Amino acid sequence: MKFLVIGLGSMGKRRIRCLQALGFQDIVGVDVREDRRLEAQTSYGIQVHSDYADSLKQHTFSGVVISLPPLLHVAAMQACLKHSTPFFVEASVVDDGLADIIHAVKQQGLLAAPSSTLHFHPAIACIRDIVASGALGTLSNVILHSGQYLPDWHTYEKVSDYYVSTPATGGAREIVPFEMTWFTEVFGFPHNVACHFRKTIHIEGAEGIADTYNAVLDYGSFLANVTVDVVSRQATRRLLINGSKQQLVWNWEDAAVNVFDGASAQWTHLPYDSGTSAAGYNKNIGENMYIDEIRAFVDAIEGKAAFPNSLDNDHAVLKLLYRLESTDAVGMAQVMSP
């Protein structure tokens, strides 16, 4: 199988490593930046080009991996549609032109695989199974905190030098749908939502973006509180689920999902292995989930299994983000001083 990777930044390089980990060596990488092309060619021994439109004309690919900044996704997907080539696309935060892409994909019957990385995290898989089993009892409330420190994302370049510094594709804004993709898979979509988002601290290069989102999701029978930020000096992902029978606690620092049973007053610890992390990445960001995600894309190309995410679902998650943001304008009740 032959693959085209469009975009040779941090995610494009990661996807090349994933493909090579799966045994694929016939890879063409595309980037407009000469330094990135040279790095990918030297580090991974792949062919490189500067224009993906030309690459799609010159070669026949089994699949395309789109690892560009979000605002460039649609043009790359259109190119894949033009050449009837299955594609995988990184998580996005903007939906301009996406409805037309979805329509065209359905008309062609083309495989489109939008990223759902955390679906493949062993902790999320464990949590998904536990919630679905009903073992926790009747759910009461859920608390999720996903926090990172924006300058830690790309230590080799300034925040102002790439897309996370602009309002439409800001770092915190991007992580909301990244988390909501797995969250809605586990709990479904909420009935009602409320959210406030703000810029709270100074981060050089991120002056124009909100760095913190606080949301309340109303599921009717239970409530969820979700905080996403890019101001956490230690990268954090913590989840608490309160049920009538059991309480589930996950802190990714522990490498285990922990469940407290009310009847026995005992904890059950469910350890997992997310694999080693690549150089320069947080130790909790193991490579296995990224490899498994690309494996799922390859399996979908070969007709072995459906990819676990769709553009329709991706669009629904983005609409959830926009609905959350729209509620911020409603304002809040003033608390009077005693």
Placement of each model-derived feature along the sequence:
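N-terminal Rossmann-like dinucleotide-binding module
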Residues: 1-44
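Predominantly a Rossmann-like dinucleotide-binding segment in NAD(P)-dependent oxidoreductases
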Residues: 118-196, 201-205
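Beta-strand-loop-alpha-helix segment that lines the small-molecule cofactor/substrate pocket
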Residues: 58, 63, 69-70, 74-119, ...
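Conserved SAM-binding strand-loop segment of SAM-dependent methyltransferases
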Residues: 45-52
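C-terminal helix-rich "cap/oligomerization" subdomain common to oxidoreductases
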Residues: 63-66, 292-338
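Contiguous beta-strand/loop segments that form the cofactor/metal-binding neighborhood of enzyme cores
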Residues: 175-256, 284, 291-304, 323, ...
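Short loop/edge segments at beta-strand edges and connector loops
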Residues: 50, 89, 114, 194-197, ...
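Glycine-rich, N-terminal phosphate-binding loop of Rossmann-like dinucleotide-binding domains
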Residues: 67-68, 146
